[in-house]
UniProtKB/Swiss-Prot annotation:
SMART domains: AAA. It holds the Pfam family ABC_tran. CDD domains: ABC_DR_subfamily_A (cd03230). It comes from the Bacteria. Keywords: ATP-binding, Nucleotide-binding, Transport. This is Uncharacterized ABC transporter ATP-binding protein YybJ. PANTHER family: ABC TRANSPORTER, ATP-BINDING PROTEIN. ATP binds at residues 34-41. GO terms for molecular function: ATP binding; ATP hydrolysis activity. SUPFAM superfamilies: P-loop containing nucleoside triphosphate hydrolases (SSF52540).
């Protein structure tokens, strides 16, 4: 669970996150939609600990970010312009990350690669991957440690229809496992097709009126 209270982030004189308060529950898929510059990616960066709020707090599983912990534990993250290592193959990219985090076995890595449909490309250099394949590998990186929280910025961007089906299936499995999942998109329709709750970002504000929250029927 993630509890956000009066979260504000200012960059110079610009308010990029504006007094956001919301609780993201476990076992739920949340979708943030809104135009470019609305604050979607900035909110994910704040929730991941990559940026420090100007005001307010973020509490994850009882621990307050930047007070009790610097970075939340067990978070899978995809953000815009996330870098892969093009000189290495798919398996090695995840293996290097697992060594840095000191988590996950080779079997966990292979399973994650298979779940995103790249099992036949383990030994292929990432430099030869299409944009869609790179995005799927990013998703494999996000899920291979079985995180409690998934923060995914445009996870289906550049992915073909078959790849989108893979991603949706993966996220539904992660939801069943009890993960808190937050994804972003420019399109409300894309959010509604997958998410339990859709929330609109607008000029740094998280709109939570009934007009813009969609709750999927049980």
């Amino acid at each position: 669970m993630i509890e956000v209270l009066n979260l504000t982030k200012k960059i110079k004189k610009t308010t990029v996150l504006d007094n956001i308060s919301y609780t993201f529950e476990k076992g739920t898929i949340y979708g943030l939609f809104g135009s470019n510059g609305s604050g979607k990616t900035m909110l994910l960066r704040a929730l991941s600990g990559l940026i420090v709020p100007t005001e307010g707090s973020i509490t994850i599983k009882g621990e307050q970010l930047h007070k009790d912990i610097s970075f939340p534990k067990s978070v899978g993250l995809i953000i815009e312009n996330m870098q892969l290592l093009p000189q290495y193959d798919a398996f090695t990219n995840l293996k290097i990350l697992s060594k840095i985090k000191k988590i996950a076995s080779d079997n966990d890595i292979l399973d994650s690669i298979s779940r995103v449909g790249l099992e036949n490309f383990n030994s292929v250099k990432v430099s030869k991957f299409s944009l869609g394949m790179k995005q799927r590998l990013n998703i494999a990186q996000a899920i291979f440690e079985k995180p409690d929280i998934l923060l995914l910025d445009e996870p289906t961007n550049a992915i073909d229809e078959k790849g989108v089906a893979f991603v949706h299936d993966i996220l539904l499995q992660e939801k069943k496992r009890g993960a808190t999942i937050i994804i972003t998109s420019h399109h409300k329709e894309d959010i509604i097709s997958l998410c339990d709750i859709a929330l609109e970002m607008n000029h740094g504000r998280l709109e939570t009126s009934e007009k813009v929250i969609y709750k999927k029927d049980s």
